[in-house]
Amino acid sequence: MEVTSYPSEKRMNTNINNLLYMNDENKIIIYQVFTRLFGNNNNHCVYNGDIATNGCGKMADFTLKALGEIKKLGTTHIWYTGIIEHATQTDYRRYNISPDHPAVVKGKAGSPYAIKDYYDVDPDLANDVQERMKEFENLVHRTHRTGLKVIIDFVPNHVARQYHSDAQPDGTTELGANDDPSQSFSPYNNFYYIPQAELRAQFDMKDGAAEPYREFPAKATGNNRFDATPNITDWYETVKLNYGVDYQNGGTCHFSPTPDTWIKMLDILLFWASKNIDGFRCDMAEMVPVEFWEWAIPQVKEVYPEILFIAEVYNPSEYRLSLIHI
C-alpha cells in the first residue's frame, strides 16, 4: 500500500480529531435513502424490467411511523436521493413530459444524476403525477414533524443529454436557450459544444428505438470529455455544464462578467431552498470551480442562513488536503 505523506500531517490529524470529537449535540447523522427503492415491496423484480413490472417506491411511503423509526436510530437528517426529475425510459407524455431516447438513459428508471428538469420532481415517486411537487412538499412537512431535517441532491456539473424543463419558473430561462453552438467555448454559453460534429457515441445509439439518438452539434460529455465520441464507460447520458472555464485552452477562467450558468444555478438553489429543505448534498462539487461556490453559497445563506451545503468527496486526496486548511 502506498502511504501518502502530507507537509502538515500533524495539523491535519488534529483537525480530524476535532471533527470526530465535536460536541454530540452538534453532530450531523445522515440517513441516506434511495427514494425510489424505499417502500417498493415487489419481490418479483425482473432484469431490465420497467416500472409496471418491477414497481417503484413513492414519497408517500415515508409515513410518520417510518420516519419516526429512522429518527430513533439517532438520525438528524435524511438524504432523499433522486428527488429531482431525471432522464427515464418511463413514458410520461400524457403529463406533458417529453420522452427520453433509450440510448441516453442508463437502465429503465434512469440515473438520478442525469437531471432532466432542475425545477421538477421525479414523476416515478408520486402517487399522483400531476401533484408530484405537492407530494414532495408534504414529504418535507412530514419529515420535519418527526424532528428530522431534509437533504436533497444538487447536481451542478452535468445534466441529461435531453435536458428540458417543463416547469421552468417565470422570470428564468432554460439552460442552453441563448447558447451559440457554433463556439466550442463561450463564457456566455451554458454548454460546451463540438461545432459541426454530430454525436458519434461508441455504442448502440438506437437501443431498441426505431431511430438512433441524434445530437448536432454534439455537446461535451459530463465527465469532461470534449469530443463527439463518448464510449460506454463515460458519463455518456450527461452533458457538461459551462461555468466559464475553458478546459481545452489551459483551463483559463472567464468569471467576469458573472457567467450565465452561475446565475441559473443560483436560481435553482434558491428555488429548492424555498421548499423548506435543510440542505444540499452537492454532487461532484470538485468539478465545479470553487469561485462559483464562494459566490453562490453566501447568497443562498443570506436568505436561508441555516441551510447546509455538503460536498461529495469523489477524490479523497483533495478532501485530505482541504483538512490542512480548516
State where each predicted segment sits.
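N-terminal structural segment of carbohydrate-active enzymes
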Residues: N13-K149, N157-V159, H164-Q168, L241
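Active-site-proximal helices and loops of the catalytic beta/alpha 8
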Residues: H158, D170-E174, D180-Q202, K264-L270, ...
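Short, well-ordered alpha-helical packing segments
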Residues: L67, Y119, F136-H144, I152, ...
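A structural signal for short, well-ordered beta-strand segments and their strand-loop junctions
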Residues: H77-Y80, V150-D153, R281-D283, I310-A311
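Short, acidic/polar
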Residues: C56-I70, P257-A273
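N-terminal amphipathic/basic-hydrophobic helices that include classical n-h-c signal peptides
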Residues: M1-N18, I326
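Glycine-rich phosphate-binding "P-loop"
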Residues: V239-I263, L270
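Aromatic- and acidic-residue-enriched segments that line the glycan-binding/catalytic groove
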Residues: H86-S111, N157-T233
